[in-house]
C-alpha cells in the first residue's frame, strides 16, 4: 500500500508540472516549446552581451589577421559586432570543449557559432510556442505562420548561407556595421539587387509599411465620435466593447473614391489577411533568394548586353552596377585573395616574341 501511494504522489508531481507548463493561466505562457526556448535564448543573449563587450579579436579569414569586434577592444555601438567563426574552422561544430583552450576558442570565433545556433533554435521554438498557445486557446494557427518569415530570413543568413559557402565565416556578423558589410559583400558576390526574389522582398517590406500606414490612418480618420473636443479620442474605446469603434463603411467609401471602388476592401477579414500575407510572402521569397544564392545561383547578369552596330558596348545601369560590384569585391578580405575570381583571366594570354 505504501508503494502505491508513493507512485501516485510521483505521478501527481509530474502531472502538476505538466499542467503548469501547459497552463494558459500563467502570466507568461511557457509551453513545451518554451522549455527549450527559454534556456537557448537566455544562453544566446548572455553570450552575445559578454562577447560584444569583451571578446578578443577573431581571426575571421583564417590568415592570422584578427579583427576586433568588442567594445573593450576599441569599438563603439555602431562598429562593434560578434565576429563570425574563423574560416579555419569552416563548418565544423566548434563548442568550447573542441578547442585546446578558451583562448583558442575565442581567437577562432567560437562565440559566434554558440550564439547563432542557440538563437536559431530559440526563435524556432518561439514560433512553435506561438502555435502551441494558439492551439491551447482554440485559435487559428496563422500567428506562427506569419512569424515563420523572419525565422526563415534569420536561418538563411546565419545557417543556410554559411552552409552553401562552406564556412561560418561567411555568415552575417552580429552588429550594425557588420550587417552592412555583409550586405555589400553579398551584392558584390551574388548581385542580389538583380535577383527577382529580393525584388519581391523589397515589395513585401515597403508595401507592408505602406499598407500598414494606410490602414492605420484610414481607421483613425473614421473613428466613431464618442468623446468631446477636450478629451483624447482614445477615451472613446473601452477594452472588450462589442460595438465597432470605427465606421468601415465610411472608410470603404473614402478609399474607393480616392483610388477606385475595387481597390477598397469591403470585408474586414479579407483586409487583415491581406495585411498579414503581403509582407510575409515577400520575406519568404527573400529568404528563398538568400538560400539559392548561398549555392551561387545568383542574380541576373545583363552586363554588356547592349552593343551598337560596330560591336561597341553601350553601358546600361546593369554595367554600372557590375562596375560597383567589382570594386566592392576587390576591397573585401583584401589580404585573403591574391587574384579575385571575377577578375582572374579565363586563360593565360600568349606572349609573342
Swiss-Prot record:
Residues 345-353 form a propeptide. The record marks 161 as: Tyrosine radical intermediate. It is found in: Plastid, Chloroplast thylakoid membrane. GO terms for cellular component: chloroplast thylakoid membrane; photosystem II. [CaMn4O5] cluster binds at residues 170, 189, 332-333, 342, 344. The record marks 344-345 as: Cleavage. It is a multi-pass membrane protein. It holds the Pfam family Photo_RC. The modification N-acetylthreonine is found at residue 2. Tyr-161 forms a radical intermediate that is referred to as redox-active TyrZ, YZ or Y-Z. One of its GO terms (molecular function) is electron transporter, transferring electrons within the cyclic electron transport pathway of photosynthesis activity. It catalyses: 2 a plastoquinone + 4 hnu + 2 H2O = 2 a plastoquinol + O2. A quinone binds at residues 215, 264-265. The modification Phosphothreonine is found at residue 2. InterPro entries: D1/D2, Photo_II_D1/D2_sf, Photo_RC_L/M, Photo_RC_L/M_CS, PSII_D1. Chlorophyll a PD1 binds at residue 198. CDD domains: Photosystem-II_D1. The D1/D2 heterodimer binds P680, chlorophylls that are the primary electron donor of PSII, and subsequent electron acceptors. It shares a non-heme iron and each subunit binds pheophytin, quinone, additional chlorophylls, carotenoids and lipids. D1 provides most of the ligands for the Mn4-Ca-O5 cluster of the oxygen-evolving complex (OEC). There is also a Cl(-1) ion associated with D1 and D2, which is required for oxygen evolution. The PSII complex binds additional chlorophylls, carotenoids and specific lipids. It is an enzyme of class 1 (oxidoreductase). Photosystem II (PSII) is a light-driven water:plastoquinone oxidoreductase that uses light energy to abstract electrons from H(2)O, generating O(2) and a proton gradient subsequently used for ATP formation. It consists of a core antenna complex that captures photons, and an electron transfer chain that converts photonic excitation into a charge separation. The D1/D2 (PsbA/PsbD) reaction center heterodimer binds P680, the primary electron donor of PSII as well as several subsequent electron acceptors. Belongs to the reaction center PufL/M/PsbA/D family. This is Photosystem II protein D1. It comes from Sorghum bicolor (Sorghum).
Amino acid at each position: 500500500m505504501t508503494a502505491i501511494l508513493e507512485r501516485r504522489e510521483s505521478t501527481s508531481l509530474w502531472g502538476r508540472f505538466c499542467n503548469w507548463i501547459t497552463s494558459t493561466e500563467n502570466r507568461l505562457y511557457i509551453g513545451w516549446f518554451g522549455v527549450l526556448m527559454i534556456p537557448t535564448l537566455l544562453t544566446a543573449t548572455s553570450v552575445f552581451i559578454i562577447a560584444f563587450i569583451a571578446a578578443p579579436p577573431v581571426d575571421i579569414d583564417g590568415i592570422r589577421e584578427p579583427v576586433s569586434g568588442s567594445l573593450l577592444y576599441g569599438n563603439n555601438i555602431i562598429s562593434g559586432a560578434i565576429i563570425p567563426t574563423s574560416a579555419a574552422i569552416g563548418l565544423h561544430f566548434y563548442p568550447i570543449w573542441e578547442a585546446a583552450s578558451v583562448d583558442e576558442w575565442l581567437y577562432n570565433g567560437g562565440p559566434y557559432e554558440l550564439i547563432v545556433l542557440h538563437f536559431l533554435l530559440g526563435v524556432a521554438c518561439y514560433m512553435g510556442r506561438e502555435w502551441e498557445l494558439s492551439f491551447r486557446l482554440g485559435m487559428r494557427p496563422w500567428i506562427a505562420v506569419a512569424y515563420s518569415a523572419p525565422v526563415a530570413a534569420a536561418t538563411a543568413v546565419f545557417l543556410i548561407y554559411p552552409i552553401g559557402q562552406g564556412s561560418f565565416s561567411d555568415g552575417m556578423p552580429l552588429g550594425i556595421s557588420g550587417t552592412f558589410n555583409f550586405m555589400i559583400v553579398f551584392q558584390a558576390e551574388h548581385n542580389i539587387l538583380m535577383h527577382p526574389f529580393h525584388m519581391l522582398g523589397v515589395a513585401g517590406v515597403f508595401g507592408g509599411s505602406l499598407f500598414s500606414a494606410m490602414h492605420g490612418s484610414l481607421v483613425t480618420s473614421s473613428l466613431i465620435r464618442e468623446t468631446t473636443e477636450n478629451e483624447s479620442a482614445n477615451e472613446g474605446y473601452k477594452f472588450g466593447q462589442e460595438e465597432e469603434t470605427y465606421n468601415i463603411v465610411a472608410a470603404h467609401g473614402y478609399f474607393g473614391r480616392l483610388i477606385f471602388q475595387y481597390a477598397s476592401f469591403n470585408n474586414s477579414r479579407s483586409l487583415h489577411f491581406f495585411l498579414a500575407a503581403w509582407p510575409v510572402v515577400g520575406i519568404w521569397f527573400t529568404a528563398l533568394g538568400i538560400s539559392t544564392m548561398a549555392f551561387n545561383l545568383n542574380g541576373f547578369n545583363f552586363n554588356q548586353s547592349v552593343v551598337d552596330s560596330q560591336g561597341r558596348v553601350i553601358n546600361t545601369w546593369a554595367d554600372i552596377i557590375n562596375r560597383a560590384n567589382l570594386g566592392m569585391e576587390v576591397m573585401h578580405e583584401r589580404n585573403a585573395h591574391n587574384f579575385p575570381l571575377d577578375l582572374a583571366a579565363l586563360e593565360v594570354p600568349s606572349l609573342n616574341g
